[in-house]
Amino acid sequence: MSIQPSEVAASSARTDTREALGIEESAFDCVSITVASPETIRKWSKGEVKNPETINYRTFKPEPGGLFCQKIFGPVRDYECACGKYKRIKYKDVVCDRCGVEVTIARVRRERMGHIELAVPVAHIWFLKSMPSRLGLLLDMTARSLERVIYYENYMVIDPGKTPLEPHQLLTDTEYRQAIDEYGEDSFVAKMGAEAVRDALVKTDLEATVAELQEQMRATKSKQIKKKLSKRLKVIQGFIHSKSRPEWMVLEVLPVIPPDLRPLVPLEGGRFATSDLNDLYRRVINRNNRLRNLMQLKTPDVIIHNEKRMLQEAVDALFDNGRHGRPVTGAGNRPLKSLSDMLKGKQGRFRQNLLGKRVDYSGRSVIVIGPELKLHQCGLPKKMALVLFEPFIIRRLKELGFVHTVRGARKMIEKKSPEVWDILEEVTKGHPVLLNRAPTLHRLSIQAFEPVLIEGEAIRVHPLVCTAYNADFDGDQMAVHVPLSLEAIMECKLLMMATSNIFSPSSGKPILTPSQDIVLGAYYLTVEPRKKPAKDERVPLLSGLQEVLYAVADGAMKKHDWVEVPNPDHGRETIFGNKEKKVLRTTVGRVIFNQIWPAGLGFVNFPVPKSKLGDLILNTHKLTGNQATVETLDRLKELGFTTAMQAGISIGIDDMIIPEAKKDIVAETRKKIAEVEAQFNKGIITEGERKNKVIDLWTGTTDRIAKEVFAKLESNEGRNEVNPVYIMMDSGARGNKQQVRQLCGTRGLMAKPSGEIIERPILSSFREGLTVLEYFISTHGARKGLADTALKTADAGYLTRKLCDVAMDVIIAEDDCGSRDGVWKKAIFEGDDEIVSLRERIVGRFSSDDVFNPINPSEILVGSGELITEEIATRVDELGIERVKVMSPLTSTAQHGIDGKSYGINPATGKVAKVGDSVGIIAAQSIGEPGTQLTMRTFHIGGVASGGFKTPEIKVRASGTVRYRGLRLVETADGGSIVLNKTGTIQIVDAEEKELETYNIVVGSFLHVGDGEQIQKGAILAQWDPYNIPVLSEKGGTLAFKDMIPGVTVKRELDESSGRIATVVIEHKEDLNPQIEIRDPKGKPLAAYSIPVGAQIAVNEGDIIQPGALLAKTPRQASKTKDITGGLPRVAELFEARRPKDAAEMSRIDGIVSFEGTVRGKRKLVVKNDDTAQEEEHLIATGKHIIVQPGDVVHKGQHLTEGAADPHEILEILGPSALYDFLISQVQEVYRLQGVAINDKHIEIIIRQMLRKVRITDPGDTENFWGEQVDRAQFLAENRRIEEAGGKPAEAEPILLGITKASLETESFISAASFQETTRVLTDASTLGKVDMLKGFKENVIMGHLIPAGTGLPKYKNLKITLPFGADLPVEPEQPAPAATETA
């Protein structure tokens, strides 16, 4: 296979000088890969390797003609031939007349290749075995039959002549002999082995085959055949385009790679360490030579065939050991590493040497905290700095004339003479270094700092950057890298300095937020004192900050004393200040706390926990910009540490106060549980209901005890000081409510490793100590937690890698692509609570359409293509606008990457994204980085995790008129009504019939308000049984059971504990459908109800019932509901676009449901639309629970059965925009559960990449085939081209690819090969003759170029400033200095 850099003509002299200056990268702009012809291989080669020997064991010199021969591959020593006749550089390029070695540098042994002339052709295993087999596609044979030919089991007919044999027909030995006897020896040609395959390929006329295949394509209607034909077409057209011949896939000449790439190293004791490739080559040469000799000796066919097969197998092992048959093993039964293994996997050439390299000028050491540092500094041990900055020191020593040679300078440095230390100080001043902490999960894991030289061995880190690095000081290590070139230093100073990374790129929240001690100090200063002054009690009035500080220093006042000071914000607008009062009543601590913040914030007169500190920092940045914020942060750090130290807060066991009420609460719960057990014993409720009720009771109890605990801690039993446990928890410095509850209250319910909840809660707290049984129960959860953590870290890393790979090439390509399409954003509700407001979702995006003020329609709030600022977003939210369409990466039409407007504001900078920003990588990191925090939460409900119990009622949020929509009701005896279907909704409308609220109504809900009645805000609209899903009857009458066969469709179980018999519907294979029929007195059926699997039947046959009676009930699985798949696996499942196990059936059209019996053991459900006369039928497995009933009106995309939604179906039925909504909301839900904020735009970028392919449904006049997947941008461009030429454009449907698939489908074969399935990607690319245009990141890193993003964009890279000779550079007016160059 040959890979050629496609050369760009460049005059070589100019290139050499520029190359020497390090300006010009190697001059090529694309790389192509094709199948190499035998001529090409011979052209690469410098000679044939005939001898399997490597080096002479006595002289250690390479054997002539062997695998290390100097004549073929070049001299072992620089400028010295093998026999020693010519030595030194003066004989450069002379070929020695005695030993035939060219006198040159030894480095040529890394690039010169040899070759082996094979005695018989040999098939290349990649083209034979890599599925789909390329040889098979070309010859239209199966891989299996090809193998029989290539490994000399069968003959293949190549030219049938006049005989009735078919071309490419396989013949066994006996059949071959019979054919010869029958037709004569010369009447047809049949051969064995790769030779037969080569001859068949030589005879293939590619052009004619293409024409024939296209004809067949037109003729056939079968999708199966079309699929097969388009596969063959693709490969054959690939060969035509790349001007390669298919017979080149069978090798006649084998290339030998340069010897220095498969070295042989002598070890002590006379043994050698060798690369496995030498062994594999040696086998090939041995077998090849033996075969040659045998063929000259007129040996019997059997022996020759065997020898030929062995040669084929030897070459297979060399290319891809283990692909065919048993792998060839070396010493200790270890499979040898073949050429393919050299490329594959983490240790392969791509990932080990091309994408990740070891770096010079770097070191690593343990980190410790550096509270004395400024934000832009880090402490670097002098010993490390001396080594890292050595070249700079040497240069400076020479400049200052201390030494004249590099050796002298090195000696001076080794002696550590005093001048060296001074020069080190000078050299490191203003020269930033990069600090990196593994795992590098997002871009903030590498930041630049100015080094401050320190004694000792450990690197010192500023405490505020610990959050970004996720570092702590329990032995973490960090690596230091020194940027060398001027450009690198500038980028570090301007872009990577810790001071310019205040905000998190994933959510735009400050990431430099203080934690632990600093938070504790700040909270301690601002906390509300215990004693409130009485109503008319006088409080000292001081003149301001200075006087307060005097009073504190004097000991006259304490930090928590009330004091009155003049209000600095009187009469001016500030963010937190009070504009009205002239005198503020506050505490001494708060006066001190306020001195560090900028005046525009106003006087902060409330306690400041961690979350409020974040707000203060955000607002400081808005008011004063970057530099002032950085200075404020440093002041906050100083103040926090000092205060925390002076406060001397520590916790003792007595501070964990156990509430007295705990006993009574537990006793009360036990009483309630006894009642539940009694109900169960009488048989009123089922086992499942009993369990759920008990668990709900205990969850409620735990919450009540927790409330008591917090109340107790807050009041601190009437002591004067604030409880230290409470301070730590409330300030957010350490510990959360859950942990404190377990210390002082109860541990609560625990989960088994399977995720089920154990019914008996742990009632003791850690303060009281656990009993043996309780301790044992709690070990379950703890151990599972540890095992999960270990397993999940690898998964999170892998997810990040896949996301990076798929989104890598998304950069901002232009400022505006001109498209004004977009996606709708609306607020997110959970139940009745708004969790994410519309404002949060649209701020920082560009609006697609004009947004009008609903109250005054002539006013445009924001125009189309304009930025939605915070002010506008707040306005939109306040005016009650439901949804806004914003521009999105999903709808951007930019050719490569996306445009700045569709991305909006870059969360890390707060400014609109610039051309060249690598937003794809940022998106992948933002989603992957929190992945490590997403524990595999096995229990979302119960466990020590959380108790999620939704109240079984709907309260309305707005007053208005009730309107029923699509509800089927039945009146009950007491005049209320009960809902019978799952698909109905109730709307609340205002006087103008404008919809205010919509509620989905649960089946079995009891409605309190009639259709068209008025309802007040907060009134209860509907209630339902939280434990069961009922099956209710619409009609009254006598009951008859159908298909209820004990032991087949239903089982009667005796409930041990309650002693009653229950009838439950069970899973069944037969064509049966358990139903309850309702008949009128004459025995005519009025209605029939299918009873789902798992339901308990609540009536007996022959009963006479009223409308609305309960026929059966299915327990709602409450205790494991949320845990379908949680956390990380769920995110991976969504991004991989996997089809769920039992996906819900979705209606494909709007229409009315009807059932039409059973077909092949499945129920047939038909949706008919009378207006359009469409009908769609669905076959539904009997075990599945159908949630619609005959006669229901369903909408397109509505679920007909229970189950999870399938993203592919959503795309197919409802189109892309519904899919966007689905995926964004599902991914966000997982992260929200963990309290992680991620901006929607990151998820949108990944989804854009998953949807970038379309599948051709009709090729029209384009060159595409039916069923081919092509890039959306390519597809549109090709169609435009065809339309301009007046042809028929192609048609296609969007398809959703999982991120792994999408990564492998990139345009660039280099990028795909370095991701996964290397051999398959390269095989594919070479047969299609692909050309890599080096547009993306990975391929450029691999080729050693700058990446085409940020400062590496061609438009910046090739920037030239032209000025008349002697002119000065234009000087920009003075700007305030950026924070990065802040003086210490």
Curated annotation (Swiss-Prot):
Its EC number is 2.7.7.6. This is DNA-directed RNA polymerase subunit beta'. It comes from the Bacteria. SMART domains: RPOLA_N. Keywords: DNA-directed RNA polymerase, Magnesium, Metal-binding, Nucleotidyltransferase, Transcription, Transferase, Zinc. DNA-dependent RNA polymerase catalyzes the transcription of DNA into RNA using the four ribonucleoside triphosphates as substrates. Belongs to the RNA polymerase beta' chain family. Mg(2+) binds at D472, D474, D476. Zn(2+) binds at C81, C83, C96, C99. InterPro entries: DNA-dir_RpoC_beta_prime (IPR045867), DNA-dir_RpoC_beta_prime_bact (IPR012754), RNA_pol_asu (IPR000722), RNA_pol_N (IPR006592), RNA_pol_Rpb1_1 (IPR007080), RNA_pol_Rpb1_3 (IPR007066), RNA_pol_Rpb1_3_sf (IPR042102), RNA_pol_Rpb1_4 (IPR007083). It catalyses: RNA(n) + a ribonucleoside 5'-triphosphate = RNA(n+1) + diphosphate. GO terms for molecular function: DNA binding; DNA-directed RNA polymerase activity; magnesium ion binding; zinc ion binding. GO terms for biological process: DNA-templated transcription. NCBIfam families: rpoC_TIGR. The RNAP catalytic core consists of 2 alpha, 1 beta, 1 beta' and 1 omega subunit. When a sigma factor is associated with the core the holoenzyme is formed, which can initiate transcription. The gene is rpoC. Binds 1 Mg(2+) ion per subunit. The keyword DNA-binding does not apply. Its cofactor is Mg(2+); Zn(2+). One of its GO terms (cellular component) is DNA-directed RNA polymerase complex.
